[in-house]
Amino acid sequence: MIKTARQLKDLIRNLSREKSADAQILMRNYMMERFLERISLSDYRDKFILKGGMLVAAMVGLDARSTMDLDATIKGANVNVEDIETLISAIVTVPIDDGVEFQLKSISEIMDEAEYPGIRVSMATIFDGVVTPLKIDISTGDAITPREVRYSFKLMLEDRSIDIWAYNLETVLAEKLETIITRATTNTRMRDFYDIYILEQLHGTTLNPEILHDALQATAHKRGSEQKLLQAEEVFDEVEDSPVMQKLWEAYRKKFSYASDLEWNVTMGAIRSIYQKMIQ
């Protein structure tokens, strides 16, 4: 067990060099893991379902994807400010001998660019005097097809895993595909494109095209975008040929070393490939 800030910083520094990853992001990831472990031991462990960037990073490795935030969906519980405050307060007080203290800073409704309503939780963790900010986005009612799965989440600095509920691969991809198709050239989130590419590269052989098809339809139905799916091929052409999207991709490549050698047409090729497998 990590007991001091010096010990933690040394481990983070070494991992940062090994993975060519930002040390600040790794510190946040460590603290998010501390929160996840508390979820896994809490009375809410069967209500929290991990999704988003932290799940993708766990699936592909920190050297291939980084994230600054934790995203989850909740089932069987109300998602409003009051109930989420009660839920979070219970989770952060789960006793674990890791020396990490959580302080709740704010809870508010998500209003920015959300495909679905939700709650944003801002916290700070304190460990041996080191303060790290955390942000958690929580939604409910997501279309998970066919259902959430038990996921063995490998810890970053320890040789063990924690069991949590998470999106299945097909639902992860379906949400990103739906966003790419419906937002077209207004989508500034290059991570959606990268995530589909890297997941196809590393997990394409385990992907079930029929489940992906059903997951995409269910996601579109939930978001009211079924008609837009009919223009998917045209959207892919428009997005790939767009100078604006190409410029955004170049900026993403410069910002994240794991994408630095990845050409835009190759990324779009992976997206087309997954889509073609799904509709055959």
Which role does the model predict for each range below?
Residues 1-48, 57-66, 70-280:
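Structured mid-to-C-terminal alpha-helical surface segments
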